[in-house]
Amino acid sequence: MFRGATMVNLDSKGRLAVPTRYRELLNEQSEGQMVCTIDLHQPCLLLYPLPEWEIIEQKLSRLSSMNPAERRVQRLLLGHASECQMDSAGRLLLATTLRQHAGLTKEVMLVGQFNKFELWDEQTWYQQVKDDIDAEQSTQEPLSERLQDLSL
């Protein structure tokens, strides 16, 4: 399980160094094989260990290519999916097109989200956190039943 937000730097080749605390787990889970794709709703990337991505691919394969909305999701997620292998120094090379899509330059936030990571431009991440907190504080919407059951 991945959790927490960590600032990492992209090097001049577009590689990010995976924090040490995740490397052993990623090597155990996927031998360092990862898949990166775009997020459909946020300006970030999604980074999955290969076995977790294969579960997503199975779900995508069950969607109908005859349904325009389902076809769009297949096209966006699969069409942008890029395999990346963690090297012996714990670095992942991110495809240029993916980095451009998410506006990633130098400072990147690696955000653990259970079975995957999100990759955000650092400033965009902090703005998103602010926007999310503001939205939670000002919302008039009733909490969903699942959120009501979430006791912190």
Curated annotation (Swiss-Prot):
GO cellular component, one term: nucleoid
GO molecular function: DNA-binding transcription factor activity; transcription cis-regulatory region binding
Locations listed in the record: Cytoplasm, Nucleoid
Highest rank taxon of the organism: Bacteria
Spans traversing the lipid bilayer: none
Domain called SpoVT-AbrB: residue spans: 5-52, 81-124
Record key words, sorted: Cytoplasm, DNA-binding, Repeat, Repressor, Transcription, Transcription regulation
Biological-process GO terms, alphabetical: negative regulation of DNA-templated transcription initiation
SUPFAM superfamilies named among the record's database cross-references: AbrB/MazE/MraZ-like
Pfam families: MraZ (PF02381)
Main location (coarse class): cytoplasm
Role played: Negatively regulates its own expression and that of the subsequent genes in the proximal part of the division and cell wall (dcw) gene cluster. Acts by binding directly to DNA. May also regulate the expression of genes outside the dcw cluster.
Family indicated by similarity: Belongs to the MraZ family.
Subunit structure: Forms oligomers.
NCBIfam families according to UniProt: division/cell wall cluster transcriptional repressor MraZ
Name of the molecule in the record: Transcriptional regulator MraZ
